[in-house]
Amino acid sequence: DINFKASYGGLSDNIIQNFYAPVLEESNIYKRSVAYFTGGIFCIATSAYKSFFIDNNGKFQLVTSPFFDEKISDAYKKYEDVFNQEDLTLDVLNKSLEKLENLQHGSDLIEFISILLNLNKLEIKIALVPEPGLYHEKIGIFADSYGNSISFSGSINETWSGWISNSEEFKVFN
């Protein structure tokens, strides 16, 4: 059991260390609904993602607006063009994840996202709303193999800036 505050906010709460990483490490499903998504999110808690994807056989299901960084588009192209399904294993994913330590950008990130897509560990759905609107929900649900879940809702997007450098607020629900 992990104890969490009812809400987190501001830069002083260290939301990666006190919320995101501990929950991710115990989960095998992460469902996220956001306006903005960037691949840099995978670089903020690599050891937690290792537990999630490798140890827990986790799956990340994402719904987002059509506005995401070029690395995601590049990863889709690589996903379609490069990888041979028989060559992809959790060991390949693990080695790719190890390369991400202390990185935020670059070809290692594109490769990692491509592997996630190929292994069906990352599922991205695009939410479209009538113009000039923008899909802008920000909800997250973590679940484990025992049926436990925890959710959160607030201002935070699934981006490096959202989790690391912005002053964001969200509420936690058991």
Language model segments and positions:
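PLD/PLD-like phosphodiesterase catalytic module centered on the HKD motif
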Residues: 1-174
